[in-house]
Structure formats: structure tokens, C-alpha cells
Amino acid sequence: MAQKKGGGSTRNGRDSESKRLGVKVYGGQAINAGGIIVRQRGTRTHAGVNVGMGKDHTLFALVDGHVKFANRGEGKKQFVDVVPAA
């Protein structure tokens, strides 16, 4: 005869790994060409001047410079630019 009750089972105990999304370089900070500025799902932030967009909507710098965030355009969308280093 068992001395302990059966442990039973659970349907919990799983979770997906975090994707580490978000802003990686903030406004006013220096960045090198190719550096990631924002990792995102969809275009929450749009690519502005001297900024490229990867196939997963990651925004990255095309030139060395400083990051600048701005709201502009229809509905005041958020854009990110890289101002080239002088």
C-alpha cells in the first residue's frame, strides 16, 4: 500500500522565451552604422532619415551619428532619424 498520495499532474509549466523587444538606443545617444535602434513587432516606430528597416521591422542606423526621435506626419506617427556626426 502506498505511503503517499499520488502526485497528480498539471497542465501548466510552459512559457515562451522573451524576445527582448524595445528601444535599444535612445534619443541623443551616439550610434554607429549598422547599430540597432529599435527591435519591434510591426511598425510602431517608423524609419526616418538615415535609418533602415529589417524584414522583422528592426530599425538600424545607416550612418554614424546621433539618434533623434520625432512625431510627425498623418496622425503624428513616431519616426526615428540618425543625424550624421559632423
Swiss-Prot record:
Gene3D superfamilies, per database record: 2.40.50.100
Entry keyword set: Ribonucleoprotein, Ribosomal protein
Domain of life: Bacteria
GO BP terms, alphabetized: translation
Annotated region described as Disordered, given as residue ranges: 1-21
GO cellular component: cytosolic large ribosomal subunit
HAMAP family assigned to the protein according to its UniProt record, in alphabetical order: Ribosomal_bL27
Family according to the record: Belongs to the bacterial ribosomal protein bL27 family.
Protein name: Large ribosomal subunit protein bL27
Organism: Ralstonia pickettii (strain 12J)
Annotated gene: rpmA
